[in-house]
Each structure stands twice: as C-alpha cells, then as structure tokens.
Design a protein with these regions (language model features):
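Cationic, histidine-enriched alpha-helical/coil surfaces that engage anionic ligands
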Residues: 1-203
Length: 203
C-alpha cells in the first residue's frame, strides 16, 4: 500500500488506504476463484481483515451508514475465506505434520487427509459462489464508488482532522487494550488477545 501524509485530512487518508486494500482484493479475486495458488486467497483474506480494522478505527471519520455497510460486507468475506484458508494451511503443512510420526502413521492418516481435501473443495466452492454472485459484485462496485467519488457534504466530526494525530491516538488505544488483555489472559481468553494483537498490527 502507498504511504499517506500525516497532515492529510483523516477521511482522505482512510479512503486512500481502503482504496489500496480494495485494489488488493480485486487483484486476488480471480486467482482465488480459479484456485491458481493459495497465496491469492491469503492476499484477499488479509486485505479484507485489514479493511475491517481500518473501518473499526474510523468511527469518527467515515460516515456511519457507509462504515456499517462496509463492515458487514468485509465480515462476510472474512467468514467465507476463513475455512478454505485454514484448510490450505493444514494441507500445505501435511507432510511436515505427519513425517515425524513415521511412514506407517502417514499411511494410516491418509483418510484424514482425504477428508480435509473434500472439506477444502467444499469451502472453496462456497467462497467462489459468493465471489461471483450479484451481491458480491454489487458490494465491491458500490464500495469502489464511495472510495473514489466526491465526499458527502455532511461528515463526522473528526473527518477533516489531520490523519497523523488521529491514527496515532487509535494505535495507542489499541496497544493499551492489548496490554490490558495480555496481563489478564486466561486459558479461555487467548482469542481475545489474538484479535487485539491483529488490530494493532493492521493499524
């Protein structure tokens, strides 16, 4: 993604970053549909999750109706890309997982591998169906129109603030949340800490 100037109006900086991420999704969409390489899905998924993190940070910059609709779309895309990506990782690492167990164990586990392949095919089919659907195409097109079109006359109260200080405050807040959750971590809460660490990384 390109760099943004810290003195840029916050809404322009957010739109620039989100437009870069939309480009990443567009570049990886067809390769994901055709299953040319697992990295296409990985790139698409990361861009969708980063878009969600940027939208979450833009509560006083991006109009509420725009942000709400975009977050719904990216949440759906994140949900649909999760299963096939997880199965890609499992199957790409299968040899490394099973080799230490010896050749006999690897043979015994072949039905498990076959099951994972079937599940992978089903997960990709579900994702591909949605990526080619009218809903997905409409969402992507309307999102692109908002990112590149004129700004609305009425904007949230921090939309025209300088980008740098606004983002710096959000990063400090996300870091503080991560540290608080890390200090209070329990066996039941690692997912919360993981999610917060991703928020910091994506910002």
């Amino acid at each position: 993604m390109g760099f943004t100037k810290p003195d840029l109006p916050a809404i322009e900086g957010f739109r620039s970053v989100l437009a870069d991420l939309a480009d990443v999704i567009a570049r990886n969409r067809q390769g994901t549909i055709e299953r040319l390489d697992p990295e296409f899905l990985h790139g698409l998924r990361v861009a969708a999750r980063r878009s969600r993190a940027v939208l979450a940070a833009g509560g006083r910059v991006i109009p509420d109706d725009v942000r709400r609709e975009a977050r719904l779309g990216f949440a759906l895309l994140s949900d649909l890309t999760g299963p096939p990506r997880d199965l890609d990782v499992y199957l790409l690492g299968w040899a490394a997982y099973t080799e230490p167990l010896g050749p006999h164990a690897a043979v015994d586990l072949e039905p498990v591998r076959a099951h994972l392949i079937r599940a992978q095919d089903e997960a990709y089919a579900t994702l591909t169906t949605w990526l080619q659907s009218e809903e997905a195409l409409d969402r992507l097109a309307s999102w692109r129109r908002w990112l590149t079109g004129p700004l609305p006359e009425v904007l949230p109260d921090r939309a025209l603030d300088p980008l740098g200080p606004y983002v710096a405050k959000r990063i400090r807040r996300a870091q503080a949340t991560l540290l608080d959750e890390g200090r209070a971590i329990t066996a039941e809460s690692p997912d919360e800490v993981r999610a917060s660490s991703e928020d910091v990384r994506y910002l």
